[in-house]
Amino acid sequence: MSVNTGRIFQRYLCGIVILVLLLISSKVFAQKEITIENVDSLTLEYFDNGQWKKLIRAGEKALDIGIESYLLRMRLGTAYFELENYFDAIPHFEKAVSTGYSDGVVKQKLYESYIYAGREEDANVVLYEMTENRRSKLRPLVNNFINDASFDIGSSFSNDHTNNGSLDLDGQDNAYGEQTINRGQFFFDVGIGQLPIRWFKINYAFTYVNRDLQKQIMFNNEKILDDYKQKQGRLFNEFRFVPVNSLMISPSGHYINSEETVIGASFDSVSYANKLHGFGKDSIRYYYTLKDTAIKKDDFILSLSVSKWISVFNPGISGSFSYLNGTHQSQIGLSIKVYPLSNPYLSIFSNAVIHNQNSVSNLIFTQTAEGRITENLWLEGFATFGKISNYNEQNGRIVYNDPDMTKLSYGAMLRYVFPFNMTAKLIYSGQSREKKMITDAISGYQNNLPVYTRQTTTAEYNFNSIALGLKYDF
């Protein structure tokens, strides 16, 4: 019984050895059979017949065993490009171009892959490596003075007056109270981009904001209403460096000038004393001195961002220092943009920022998702969570400098891409805001004059904006 068992084991072991030898020999034979010549012949056949998936399987297998050539990279890149997998096409086109044998067609496909993948800065580098004739076909109006131009215009409205315009501001003591009603705003933005050097882009933008505000002052149940405008002029400047492929370093600055003339009140102790002795009328104007005050502010933001493309991932880090509404702020954030389908038709962007003001830090988180609806129409949704006040995003381009705190910002954008280098967009954004109101309560008397204790209360309202925008790439 033991002899039979031993023979069976020997035969089993011998069979395994023979099978392993056959596998090794077949693999060696296959490697000998797969040469540059037959890979070139096979991929050329697939290339000419538009059999892109078969070409990818054969080409990637050839790369795995160490076969490398310009034609293989060019054909693989083209196969991924035709299947709209632009992120997979990019490294093959880059490798083909790096050999020095690439023609204009390969560079054009690399340029278009960068554009479709959202890598504008890398695309600009490739654009200026092409011949002037091919460059003019892609960008007919390309020039050294202006690379792109944009214009946005919009209007905002709120329910602040509806919700809070009739509040009893002076409290139970009818002492004193005030608030500012934000009724909306009108704004427009003009931007241009220059490309003096293919790896160095400069962006400029001017933004005008006209806010419709109302100051309410209340004393002894009498309310004074003062309608006024706050006008802001904003200048933004950004530099984008591409020191090496896929890496972008971008410092920026944003200057904000605001002007307004608003009524202010100061307690008039003489008038109040006369009132106590029977002089004067029971009016706010006899207890407080009202005066129009011109207010001018100069604010700024200095920002820096660094990002790096790694396949379908674009991680980044950003930081800023700012002076807004009389206080200093600092921010540091981490972000990542992902194309989960390896094509540009779905992207997800996440950004987490630590914002510090007056030694108080809070976390602000932004989530964005964009997808293609039809061939040229795109839809983006976005939301920002946190205590948003004196805050900036997009490397200082977008500023939240309203004195009222935004608790939630959300919205959507429709973007249409025309075939002649123009993009149009329609944007809706909404904000849930919280503002502060002042109420003075009498806590006692000194020398026949009241002693006030100032109290701060809060009120909420919604703020909505609609904007239209156009951008043209020359």
Model regions: which residues?
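Cleavable N-terminal signal peptides
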Residues: 18, 28-29
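Outer-membrane beta-barrel strand-turn architecture
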Residues: 83, 117, 192-200, 231, ...
